[in-house]
Amino acid sequence: MYTRKTLETEIAVELRRGGALQVETPIPFLTHMVETLLKYAGLGGSVAARELRRLDDGHHVIEDVAIALGRALDALLGERKGIARFGWAAVPMDDSFALAAVDLGGRPYWAVKAKLPDVSIGGYPLRMFPHFVRTLAAEAKATVHIYARGADPHHKVEAAHKALGLALRQAMAPGESPSTKGVLG
């Protein structure tokens, strides 16, 4: 289990391959997206987030959940031996379409291409989506690329989380952990 406590938040994340999943955050759309990401990644466990002091529009909760998720995923991956390493997925969702590609080779990088309006959905400012991905990628030591398009911003962001989850599932599947260097990272 990974825990993070700051003056603003208290986060606890436990991840495992498969099994039941429980996610609770003070931001309904964040809860929905984390559930979506982990379910499509084939991960079980729990994510519990509490906001101890409200300072802004949820920035600290969203960021700290991404930090904790990334660190818990990094711990779950361990030495990253025996995994496929790479994963990618395309997800259509009504009017929206998202692509995600990941490399779990231990080198953090992120790129998100998605035009999102400056609005909030369920307490989640959509401008935080790229920051969530960047933070998750950095803490998980993963390369993450996401492209999403569509008319409905909810569908666009949800399709992106589904695609990222499916890409993670593929990358975590048993495999050779290919590397021309002989080591990852």
From Swiss-Prot:
It catalyses: D-erythro-1-(imidazol-4-yl)glycerol 3-phosphate = 3-(imidazol-4-yl)-2-oxopropyl phosphate + H2O. The keyword Amino-acid biosynthesis applies. It is an enzyme of class 4 (lyase). It comes from the Archaea. Pfam families: IGPD. GO terms for biological process: L-histidine biosynthetic process. The keyword Lyase applies. Pathway: Amino-acid biosynthesis; L-histidine biosynthesis; L-histidine from 5-phospho-alpha-D-ribose 1-diphosphate: step 6/9. Keywords: Amino-acid biosynthesis, Cytoplasm, Histidine biosynthesis, Lyase. Its EC number is 4.2.1.19. This is Imidazoleglycerol-phosphate dehydratase.
